[in-house]
Amino acid sequence: MSETSCSFFIEKEFQDGQLENVSAGLSSSYKDKGALMAFRGIPISELTNHGILQALTAETNGWQPGVVSEEVLRAQEEWEVVDTIHPDIESGVHCQQPGQLISFNEALEHFQSVDLSSFKKRIQPTIQRTGLAALRHCLFGPPKLHQGLREERDLVLTIAQCGLDSQNPTHGRVLQTIYKKLTGSKFDCALHGDHWEDLGFQGANPATDLRGAGFLALLHLLYLVMDSKTFLMAQEIFRLSHHHIQQFPFCLMSVNITRIAIQALREECLSRECNRRQKVIPVVNSFYAATFLHLARVWRTQQKTILDSGFVLKDLEALAKKSPKRLLKTLDDYLAQVSKGQTSLLEAHKRPGSQGPHSRDLTFTGVCDLQSHSFESAGLI
């Protein structure tokens, strides 16, 4: 920027940050383009630190409000909004970079780098069978997991033994990321509060809803919202969970699906696919997403409500353990179609001959047996 086009100087700065004199001058070629043209190369933070924004929008040194451009006013308004946002100091989380989202891989690396030996002692990697059950499993059951993959399997089961620690910065970032991605919020929120009920937790503290799944339940939610291939699916299921009739607790349902994934892994239902891919964690993640997708389709197409949840989850677990390959194939097909913009979860898989959204040709038996509206009696916990 040349001296002929713009010049400004600051003669003296008081200790309180106010300026004794700010002088700005523009050449005639810039007067018609608005005041901000002269300062376009200066960050807004510098403008406010030196009082230049105030000088541009006040009657100082001959500057009249009438000559202030809309761009200057808009910049000032944006800065004032930013200046009024205060970090969450009550949540107990002190991140080095507040507000930064965390990826699934970064969260996983955290657990790979810390000592989990006390949690690992609690795991039971496989189901112990005896008698005829053991013989039947040996003859007709799935293959055993390859030796080289067992450490990765044990890590998954160990994470499921870990609880949520609100004082741990990584744990806090995982929660914040899930909240921001599902709600679209750009700002941090308290780790305890009623706003977590909006996401489908039972109460103000998400930690109380992780029984039987531990932190793995949160890692699965993180995977769902941070993977570009499954994020749209997560949004659609979350939207379905807020349906005025078919609403259900999104996060609580997700925790139950993580439990199903844990059981499928321990019962070696996923061993064949893990051996084929030579990986465990990606298979478990995909199995979780595929099971959630199937639940959402059943919920949508069969007009399920919270009263049906116990039966839906029971049938879902049986199907998932019996036909994991089928579920994974369905997920792959769905994601391929979504990437081409050819399908929507909320409109997918209507059976031929269906009489519309209220068709009852597909039902679970005993659906009306549940009388209570509570999550516990519905079989969600």
Curated annotation (Swiss-Prot):
Please name the Pfam families in this protein's record. ELMO_CED12
The species this protein belongs to is Mus musculus
Q: Which cysteines are joined by disulfide bonds?
A: none
User: What is the tissue specificity?
Assistant: Both isoform 1 and isoform 2 are widely expressed.
What cellular component GO annotations does this protein have?
cilium; cytoskeleton; Golgi apparatus; kinocilium; stereocilium
Q: Where in the cell is it found?
A: Cell projection, Stereocilium; Cell projection, Kinocilium; Cytoplasm, Cytoskeleton
Keyword Cytoplasm carried by entry:
yes
Q: Which gene is transcribed and translated to give this protein?
A: Elmod3
Q: Report the protein's function.
A: Acts as a GTPase-activating protein (GAP) for ARL2 with low specific activity.
Residue ranges annotated for the ELMO domain, each copy included: 170-324
GO biological-process terms attached to the record: auditory receptor cell development; cilium assembly; cytoskeleton organization; gene expression; protein localization; protein transport; sensory perception of sound; stereocilium maintenance
Major localization listed first in the record, in broad terms: other
Question: Could you identify this protein by its name?
Answer: ELMO domain-containing protein 3
Query: What keywords would UniProt list here?
Result: Cell projection, Cilium, Cytoplasm, Cytoskeleton, GTPase activation
